């Protein structure tokens, strides 16, 4: 629901709403144009009806056992397969995920308690994860023997024309979208299970949830192998 550019200093009340030139436009969602703006319009309608009793939850990247996207599941799938895994970008990249079970349980508690109101950024965890410790922790917790090879995006874009599906792992540097302030939600009781627990639950159901649009995460196996070979050859 936020307008760009979002900064890491922004909270629920300082960040600007995304807006649409024509609120009645019902054309296809366009991320960065109409998607967030429509969320903002929904919040405004809820607030009109419920006033100061309105609760508007603003999730970040949601994952969990029913997640049909590859924004988190890709890494688990690759670790189950094993072998060397290409990881794009910076190894200290901040990333935020929240387990749907944590978010939904908290939302139910807010309604039961009846004292909450206003907007809340439902993003996890208490502090943003960092890419390398997150993936290494997932690998170790799953018992995978995979190795992780970090390759800069600038090099990748020069080496291939294939457009991969890496979800929030795009870009050459940290993204404010992955560093959203969640202080208000935590103060209102939002808690987070260990990411390893989320991973364990998801791995048990990897093949039971169809991938959205049938598009697997990352590069094709052939491209990933080719890029890794080229990278190692250049690095000596």
Give each language-model segment a name.
Residues 40-66:
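Conserved beta-loop-beta element that borders a ligand/cofactor-binding pocket
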Residues 1-40, 48, 55:
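Conserved Rossmann-fold NAD(P)-dependent oxidoreductase catalytic core, especially the SDR/UDP-sugar
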Residues 109-173, 181-183, 201-203, 209-236:
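Mid/C-terminal beta-alpha module of Rossmann-like enzyme folds, strongest
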Residues 76-88, 144-145, 177:
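A short C-terminal helix-loop "cap" of Rossmann-like NAD(P)-dependent dehydrogenase/epimerase domains
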Residues 1, 61-63, 92-93, 127-128:
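Short, solvent-exposed loop/turn segments at secondary-structure junctions
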Residues 69-75, 88-111, 117-121, 197:
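Substrate-positioning beta->alpha
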Residues 67, 98, 129, 180, ...:
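Residue-level signal for the nucleotide or nucleotide-sugar donor/cofactor binding architecture
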């Amino acid at each position: 629901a936020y307008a760009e550019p979002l900064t890491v200093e922004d909270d629920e009340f300082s960040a600007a709403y995304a807006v649409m030139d024509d609120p009645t436009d019902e054309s296809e969602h366009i991320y960065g144009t109409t998607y967030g703006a429509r969320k903002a319009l929904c919040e405004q309608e809820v607030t009109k009806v419920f006033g100061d009793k309105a609760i508007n939850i603003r999730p970040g990247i949601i994952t969990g056992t029913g997640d049909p996207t590859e924004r988190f599941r890709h890494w688990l799938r690759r670790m189950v397969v094993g072998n060397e895994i290409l990881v794009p970008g910076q190894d200290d990249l901040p990333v935020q995920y929240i387990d749907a079970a944590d978010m939904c349980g908290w939302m139910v508690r807010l309604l039961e308690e009846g004292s909450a109101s206003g907007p809340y950024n439902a993003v996890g965890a208490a502090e943003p994860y960092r890419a390398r410790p997150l993936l290494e922790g997932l690998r170790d917790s799953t018992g995978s023997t995979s190795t992780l090879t970090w390759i800069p995006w600038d090099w990748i874009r020069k080496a291939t024309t294939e457009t991969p599906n890496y979800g929030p792992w795009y870009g050459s540097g940290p993204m404010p979208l992955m560093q959203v302030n969640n202080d208000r939600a935590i103060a209102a009781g939002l808690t987070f299970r260990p990411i390893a627990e989320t991973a364990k639950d998801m791995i048990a159901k990897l093949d039971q949830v169809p991938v959205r649009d049938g598009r697997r995460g990352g590069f094709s196996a052939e491209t990933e192998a080719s890029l890794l070979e080229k990278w190692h050859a250049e690095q000596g």
